[in-house]
């Protein structure tokens, strides 16, 4: 392991020198003692030609030379536009996670070890030449004995030691950055590397990816918008995933889409609808929707349907995050910057002590220029990015789910405008958001929320009883006293009145519902009424 670490260090140093990344480092506002280090680096004593490549290109090429783990880290960084200069973020978007396949016999041996069976006993056909190969896994086509066409995804062998060593160096660099630079501390580099560590190890667990795929497939069962391939759970293991093979056109295959006369406007709009459906209906979204993971069905090109693969990275939002996000978007497009600032504070995304007026002014300064463009040219992803950048200046905590959301939105938006340049994202999204907001306060939703709260009443009653017993239990050193003081009387009567009113309202709501619902849920209302009456009339 130590030999691997030393070899890796020399490799990193060689790449740093080759692409002159030290120039990028020393251009930052560093302490004097850190700047003095440049005079003791031997390679800086020699004459150096000025590089013709931009800093973004040099950074991207360096990550490519350092291998797949650094490539994937660069891809993660490309989604953090709130942390990086735009020129570097744009270059990192070009990173391609493509590496040569590993030996096919090694792949077969690994699959057989995971399945506990020979390839010929599980598959009637297995293509030894892989369909695709990436840094974490490669994919082979096959056919099950039962006749289904499938793909078999297998994790590369020996990845964990390499990942562990590369992550160790990334953590060292991140901690150094936090120690020497106040600006770097604001960007939380150690937290960024920790997020990447979780992401990369999650991708090594193909059972997690299988579960994500099954969830997404269930969410869109019977949908005209999106199809997710079936997972064959009998043959899934931590390092092997077997799922239905799909046939479709790559979403970036413009010539193929044109040949089959695909309705490009509908295709672009359906992509936006899929995004908002995942966010606001399901609160579960595919967070790696780059063009390599998206296909278009060749069936019914006049009503095109997407096909999504590779659900290794997913995100989810809490109901509170959903609500604040929707309200933020509405407030932003109404140019109600005070409301946007207040929502950020109310949600806990920025500290409660943030000065509202200053935060509002900062948001206005950044966002007003955006509205000089026609509405159809305004980028949702850029809106979120600008809001996050501004909020970071006010110590906004990193919200991993919002980072994934921004990344997904940028992918969907960029893809939609590539398919149909006239796509008006706000006009497409606004009806969906308005419908979602209405449904949030509909009687059906409110009744459902009430039912879920009613189900908690037995637990609440038990907790209340335990609390009252603890309150009434005297300490050993205290003289015996009644379970409540006379000064508690008004509070207890107020609690009783609240229980009485709550029970009456709940009983009325239940009486408006179906009869079978009434019989199941009437007793909690009765308990509330009895407890309320007792607290009011008792002496």
Curated annotation (Swiss-Prot):
It is a multi-pass membrane protein. Residues 125-492 form the Protein kinase domain. It comes from Pseudomonas syringae pv. tomato (strain ATCC BAA-871 / DC3000). Its EC number is 2.7.-.-. It comes from the Bacteria. Is probably a protein kinase regulator of UbiI activity which is involved in aerobic coenzyme Q (ubiquinone) biosynthesis. It is found in: Cell inner membrane. This is Probable protein kinase UbiB. The chain crosses the membrane at residues 23-43, 494-514, 517-537. One of its GO terms (molecular function) is ATP binding. Pathway: Cofactor biosynthesis; ubiquinone biosynthesis [regulation]. Signal peptide: none annotated.
